[in-house]
Amino acid sequence: MLKAEYQHRGPQPHEVIAAVALQLAEPAAGQVRIKVLAAPINPSDVLTLTGEYGMLPPLPAIGGNEGVGRVEALGAEVSNLKVGQMVLLPVGCGTWVSHLNAAANKLIPLPEADPQQLAMLTVNP
């Protein structure tokens, strides 16, 4: 598993972000594990890497403000989603990863469609 992490910000986004190994725990109660299918690069992502966006996550951080994925595993007490379901990821959750765990109640179920198109439903630059 991989994540696109940055430890600092700078004027050249490609110089501050790197693919690094991701260790992911099993989903906790109320969470699901998601395989990320598509996560676009928008102006808001670039401005976050350069430090020019209005809201900046604490460092180190994982890039990506929007995306879509497929549920791979359910934590205890999850009844609103099922394995194999496509979902819209929470805005700003660090979507430039191969997999992530997210709160099931923050995910939006999606119909089966092109993940690249669905991945761009939430963020405006």
Task: List the model feature ranges, each with a label.
Residues M1-L2:
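Extreme N-terminal starter segment of soluble prokaryotic enzymes
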Residues Q7-Q12, A39-I41:
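Short polar catalytic/cofactor-binding loops
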Residues P13-A21, E52-Y53:
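Short gly/ser/thr-rich secondary-structure transition/capping motifs
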Residues A19, L24, V68-R70, H99-N101, ...:
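Conserved hydrophobic/aromatic beta-strand scaffold that supports enzyme active sites
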Residues Q23-P40, E52-G94:
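Glycine-rich beta-strand-centered segment in the early N-terminal region that forms part
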Residues S44-T50:
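Cytochrome P450 core scaffold surrounding the K-helix E-X-X-R motif
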Residues M86-P125:
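NAD(P)H dinucleotide-binding glycine-rich loop of Rossmann-like/cofactor-binding domains
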